[in-house]
Design a protein with these regions (language model features):
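Short loop-beta-helix segment that forms the pyridoxal 5′-phosphate
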Residues: 33-37, 54-73
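N-terminal entrance/gating region of PLP-dependent enzymes' catalytic architecture
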Residues: 1-47, 53
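Conserved PLP-enzyme active-site core in the AAT-like
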Residues: 70-172
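Short, hydrophobic/aromatic alpha-helical segments in well-folded domains
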Residues: 48-51, 61, 75, 103
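Short, well-ordered beta-to-alpha junction loops that form the rim of enzyme active sites
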Residues: 7, 65, 95
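Extended, polar/acidic
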Residues: 1-13, 56, 98-103, 110-111, ...
């Protein structure tokens, strides 16, 4: 059962719980100075990137961001820099997590981007202009599983980059 908002009933092994989830070094700005710890962290990040490439089929992946909202906002910024048109419109599915939408809206304003939050089925059909990008959530914030292929095609028809915020276990 996907209860939504990014929280799903999964079993977390104790060793992962204790050494990663409960270790403040992973979710604060703390930078380890011991070379052995730094090397271990680099190896873990490389393995994470490889797992993302394997799950998604993408050519490259990044592992330097700590939360989904920041990663989505960075993807919007990258899409904006790659954008060939004069568009400044970013589409965000209303099915994205609220915290992700908030971070995107906050980061888009200083870049001069307008954010349209809406239903991907209706809003993308009604758009008449190009967009910088479109952001979709998988599974959705209410826990629903939906094939994003049609929405991705609509985003591409508007010359936008498709960005997906995914739960890794849903891709496995």
């Amino acid at each position: 059962n996907f209860i939504g908002m990014g929280y799903y009933g999964t079993y977390t092994p104790y060793v992962i719980l204790r050494n990663i989830l409960e270790n403040p070094g992973w979710y604060t700005s703390y930078t380890p100075y011991q070379p052995e710890v730094a090397q271990g962290r680099l190896e873990m990040l490389l393995n994470f990137q490889q797992m993302i490439v394997d799950f998604t089929g993408m050519d490259i992946a990044n592992a330097s961001l700590l939360d989904e909202g920041t990663a989505a906002a960075e993807a919007v910024g990258l899409s904006h820099r790659l954008n060939k048109s004069d568009s400044n419109l970013v589409f965000v599915s209303e099915n994205c997590h609220p915290q992700t939408i908030d971070v995107i809206q906050t980061r888009a304003e200083p870049m001069g981007l307008k954010v349209l939050v809406g239903n991907e089925d209706k809003a993308l059909d009604n758009l008449k202009e190009d967009i910088v990008c479109g952001i979709l959530q998988y599974p959705g914030t209410l826990g629903d599983i939906k094939d994003p292929s049609e929405a991705i095609s609509k985003i591409h028809k508007r010359n936008g980059k498709a960005i997906l915020a995914c739960d890794l276990l849903a891709l496995a």
